[in-house]
């Protein structure tokens, strides 16, 4: 965790908040830590099963940023990520459907809250 003075950037790197296979990971910005500016989550897909995972963010506020680094090992199976939540809109950089994480790939998903219920999502593959 890196913390600055008042008005400065505060970043918290979280490794304890994990993706759950074929389920929704809900990031409650109140319960999962006080992320004043940024939160970074490190997640890994391992094993050979098919996983379709959702990420939801609750109790957000405008101009807060959430970064997800998602890696995948070399085992077989389909691994996908999407964002969804009741009453929340996630404007994704991919056009439709889910983001497939290919074998041995790492992706960074950057999420900016434009309000408590609206988010911009950008996905970038790390090469």
Language model regions located:
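Terminal beta-strand-rich extracellular "head" domains
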Residues: 85-103
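Extracellular disulfide-bonded cysteine-rich modules/repeats
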Residues: 1-2, 103-113
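Exposed extracellular interaction/assembly regions and N-terminal maturation sites
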Residues: 2-86, 113-127
């Amino acid at each position: 965790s890196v913390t600055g003075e008042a008005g400065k950037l505060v970043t918290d790197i979280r490794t304890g908040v994990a993706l759950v296979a074929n389920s929704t990971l809900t990031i409650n910005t109140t319960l999962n830590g006080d992320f004043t500016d940024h939160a970074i989550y490190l997640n890994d897909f391992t094993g050979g099963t098919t996983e379709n995972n959702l990420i939801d963010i609750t109790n957000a506020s405008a101009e807060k940023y959430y970064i997800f680094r998602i890696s995948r090992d070399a085992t077989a199976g389909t691994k996908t990520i999407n964002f969804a939540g009741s009453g929340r809109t996630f404007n994704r950089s991919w056009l439709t459907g889910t983001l497939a994480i290919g074998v041995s790939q790492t992706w960074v998903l950057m999420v900016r809250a434009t309000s408590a219920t609206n988010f911009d999502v950008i996905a970038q593959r790390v090469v």
